[in-house]
């Protein structure tokens, strides 16, 4: 399946031949187990101008597809990070050299980091079993997270409940934690993590924050004020199919796992599937692209479930979607360069959130609107939230800035979560103090 993502369809094959090829690839993948990334590297390029950015974008459209952008070509001031398969390294490096594009190697061998990550998880799992505990400083599988959710809700039923909001494409439960001190249809705050399945630090951060809420309530006067007036909803695994796949087969899978008749590349980018500038810049109509938008807005059950839930609730005041990596706090719009009506308020709130975050461990984040800070992105969740009347809509990009990328070591889970919590609390406090 990684092969179809890297290479797209083979030209000149009949539909039957294509199906046969894909079936053979599937059998081989099952036989071999997880996709191996030995020798794959992450290269960083700093484009000097728009022409060089265009040359980098051309790499993604080549067949076979030669690169997987971790930080795509956006603007000359931002570095471009791309994973290059070992087999494509000579041709990609030659391409860069021929066009005067200087590069550095951020990750020399991806598989080395993956092996370290897997070993750390195995060690943590043995310790958890021997002590009958759950480690908040380790990465976990989907089954482990869902089991933790059940235990967590049972232990803290006075403050937390579990809500089933729908089913994924592969029929997995989509679960949301509700933190509430009671009262019907109160003003609410939405937080989601893991919409892109390979961003494991976000799931781990969502788990840690959930535990922080129950531990701090009653001790933290700011949190107590928030929960005495508002409810907090956290969706820890927004893309359960993709997340399960990152553990079973392809650690670097980004999209969900939906398929369509007659289309042989799998998955939709769930953060391009919302009804907010759908199909515009920063999304892709090619099903083999990592930013494939899907056939229609809200076509994906994982997106539709959130839309139906938030719309049905009708009283959400803030929506925060947590991603990695790049160390940013951003607000709408992604699909337009036009500033939103309360741009100044969101700018100042993002600034305050970044200040609060920085005080914890000294980590520097940047902030601003999505389209001016990161890149143009259409059909994204926070744009939909803002257009739906949710005034305080933010997107976070957590650690780091590229040393590890999506493969952030587990040793950074707790510090990342601690600083993220302070930024979140800043936004929640502002939302509480500025009702609308």
Swiss-Prot record:
Domain of life: Eukaryota
Signal peptide: 1-33
Cellular localization per UniProt: Secreted
EC number assigned by the record: 3.4.17.-
Enzyme superclass (EC): hydrolase
Propeptide: 34-126
Pfam families for this protein: Peptidase_M14, Propep_M14
Cofactor(s) this protein requires: Zn(2+)
The keyword Secreted belongs to this UniProt entry's keyword annotation: yes
Record GO terms (molecular function): metallocarboxypeptidase activity; peptidase activity; zinc ion binding
Listed GO biological process terms: proteolysis
Domain Peptidase M14, chain residue ranges per copy: 138-431
Intrachain disulfide bonds: 265-288
Cofactor binding: number and manner: Binds 1 zinc ion per subunit.
Tissue: Detected in testis germ cells.
Entry keywords, A to Z: Carboxypeptidase, Cleavage on pair of basic residues, Disulfide bond, Hydrolase, Metal-binding, Metalloprotease, Protease, Secreted, Signal, Zinc, Zymogen
Active-site annotation: 397
Residues holding Zn(2+): 196, 199, 323
GO cellular component annotations of the record: extracellular region
Keyword Ribonucleoprotein: no
Annotated binding of substrate, by residue: 196-199, 254, 271-272, 324-325, 375
UniProt family annotation: Belongs to the peptidase M14 family.
Protein name as annotated: Carboxypeptidase A5
Source species: Mus musculus
Lineage: Eukaryota, Metazoa, Chordata, Craniata, Vertebrata
